[in-house]
Amino acid sequence: MTHIPKTPADTETLLSEVQGWKHRHVLDLDNFSREELDMVMQTAGVMLDILSRPVKKVPALKGKTIATLFYEPSTRTRSSFELAAKSLSADVLNLNVSQSSISKGESLLDTLDTLESLGADMVVMRHPLSGAPYLAANNCHANIINAGDGWHAHPSQALLDIFTILRHKSSLEGLKITLIGDIKHSRVAHSNIWGLSKMGAKITLCAPYTLLPEGLNTNSKIFPEVTLETDIKQAVSGADVVMGLRLQRERQQSGLLPGIREYARYFQLNEEILKLAKSNALVMHPGPVNEDIELSQSVVHGEQSVIKEQVKNGVAVRMALFYLCSGSKEI
């Protein structure tokens, strides 16, 4: 069972437990052990306590510089990382891609060289090409935190999803967690499959055939607890957690869907469908939500929704990642 610290008294315990952290970068969750995932959860619990204090700031990363490098638009993720860095007293360098040398054709590696020359100790990056953060990690000295690369991965989102579930459930072991939406093109889904599996959850992926991942079958060797489903009623039945995923409009243009309304008719999580889940089931979504398409408006704002809590917890989880990767010994 994962213990999430909820009081300041746990800080000393945390400092003695996180010394075994080995990762310089956070690129995805495939190379994280169960123990390392637990370590992130424990650290995030302490960070969440810090954020509840009158002064929401500690000097753990004072003197460090964290750069944000986003090649794709982002509001909540970029703001969350920036607030996390500032809450640890780090200096933040925001690079505006549209107004930088990148818009003139500067390469990723040249941009990273520039950021390192400016003193960046860590770089949070989002890139449209899968694998770009790995290229960065192999070619610069700064810590790289992947804030989303192509269809590949979004590890901090998966970690905050796990953390949010653990704020309500004592363990993920044996929980039925259903993900509904564009699984095939969702970096959030891909990282969650790794993270939730390692935490012992039973995962159901629900989507039209055209939006289910190729090469992943029910009860596969790598993910024996993953089930693929095209019937939303079967997918949601008995679920402990139901997570909607953003339907990207460009998928309709590519011919993978007959239409947005057609999708909503068969795959929208509404109150009637939600009744098939357990009575205490959590409703989640990484955002932004297309209301009345992926989730009905009443479900988004209903009592079982923890979507706003996910946003809040995201800051604590990203603080934890900064803290752990920095090697800091103080909070």
Swiss-Prot record:
Carbamoyl phosphate binds at residues 76-77, 126, 154, 157, 287-288. The keyword Transferase applies. Disulfide bonds: none annotated. The keyword Transferase applies. Its EC number is 2.1.3.2. It catalyses: carbamoyl phosphate + L-aspartate = N-carbamoyl-L-aspartate + phosphate + H(+). It comes from the Bacteria. PROSITE patterns: CARBAMOYLTRANSFERASE (PS00097). L-aspartate binds at residues 104, 187, 246. GO terms for molecular function: amino acid binding; aspartate carbamoyltransferase activity. SUPFAM superfamilies: Aspartate/ornithine carbamoyltransferase. Keywords: Pyrimidine biosynthesis, Transferase. InterPro entries: Asp/Orn_carbamoyltranf_P-bd (IPR006132), Asp/Orn_carbamoylTrfase (IPR006130), Asp/Orn_carbamoylTrfase_sf (IPR036901), Asp_carbamoyltransf (IPR002082), Asp_carbamoyltransf_Asp/Orn-bd (IPR006131). Pathway: Pyrimidine metabolism; UMP biosynthesis via de novo pathway; (S)-dihydroorotate from bicarbonate: step 2/3. Pfam families: OTCace, OTCace_N. Belongs to the aspartate/ornithine carbamoyltransferase superfamily. ATCase family. Catalyzes the condensation of carbamoyl phosphate and aspartate to form carbamoyl aspartate and inorganic phosphate, the committed step in the de novo pyrimidine nucleotide biosynthesis pathway. Heterododecamer (2C3:3R2) of six catalytic PyrB chains organized as two trimers (C3), and six regulatory PyrI chains organized as three dimers (R2). NCBIfam families: asp_carb_tr, PRK00856.1. HAMAP family: Asp_carb_tr (MF_00001). This is Aspartate carbamoyltransferase catalytic subunit. It comes from Dehalococcoides mccartyi (strain ATCC BAA-2100 / JCM 16839 / KCTC 5957 / BAV1). The gene is pyrB.
